[in-house]
Amino acid sequence: MKAIQIEKNGGPEVLNFVDLAVPQPKPNEVLVKISAAGINFIDIYFREGMYPRALPFVDGQEASGVVSALGSEVTSFKVGDRVAYTGVLGAYAEFAVVPAGRLVRVPQGITDHQAAAAMLQGMTAHYLVHDAFPLQKGQTALIHAAAGGVGLLLVQMAKDIGARVIATVGTEEKAKLARGAGADEVILYKEQDFEVETKRIMDGKGVDVIYDGVGKTTFEQDLNLLRPRGYLICFGAASGPVPPFDLQRLAPKGSLFLTRPSLMHYIASSEELQRRAADVLGMIEAGKLKLRIEHVYPLKDAQQAQRDLAGRKTTGKLLLIP
């Protein structure tokens, strides 16, 4: 099979397009023929070595596909079932083996591309607004990178709840996308200081929660924008990881809450995974959640796909097709 293998950590150039043997499922695993694989910042973190992984490995951990073979102990699926998953490395390939307990069924009304696009980013947006900080009607959320893959979904989910959304984006094109997703106020951070603008919009009051997937370049200003006992949810590090931080600073700023959550801890059990996936896919089927799939790349172009994502040149979701 064709696959994208990493033999050493580094830049996009270490993404090698290679021939590998088709993996064989263990007793509790399923062999999935990949239809589409999602491209995410976490793939870059693994490639760079921010998240250590034994080498070599096949990058990517989000995909949709069709069951091709079953391990001897798997009874919950059959060959030909349409499935999707996230959280298991190996998606940048024609085939991948996935533990049966990590797979979700894809409803008939959801396309392969939609399923691949919804797993990691859709469930991330879902746990952020429902669990990391259970957003309520009438509250105000500041959402960074609001035209990105997670950002556009966060805006839509926050508005579905009835919250007020202040969004930050880098360009006017991205501002239009954020407004189209429902953002009440949009700040172009390259032209305006987002801290100054947010304080103006809020009449000097703090927001209830900040959803920040940017990291290093926004963190310090975020701390100045929360109400007393407000929440800063740092769920990503697109600009780099946040430097070591003195927790004592949270008290004088209003007894703030700070967390660095990961999706994997919010889909740790099969029951929670199935419930969260069903909610997200159900919102898509009902038309409440619109996915923006900006670009689809052939598998061999994984290097360019990750360059485009890291360069903040993209909006919405990027996919690889084996």
Which residues fall in each region the model found?
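Short glycine-centered segments of the SAM/dcSAM-binding site in methyltransferase folds
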Residues: 82, 140, 164, 230-231, ...
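Hydrophobic/small residue at the entry helix of a nucleotide-binding pocket
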Residues: 150
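C-terminal hydrophobic helical "lid"/dimerization subdomain
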Residues: 270-322
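Adenosine-nucleotide cofactor-binding segment
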Residues: 159-218, 269-272
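NAD(P)H dinucleotide-binding glycine-rich loop of Rossmann-like/cofactor-binding domains
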Residues: 45, 85-147
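Glycine-rich beta-strand-centered segment in the early N-terminal region that forms part
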Residues: 21-38, 48-90
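Glycine-rich phosphate-binding loop and adjacent beta-alpha segment
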Residues: 169-172, 217-288, 322
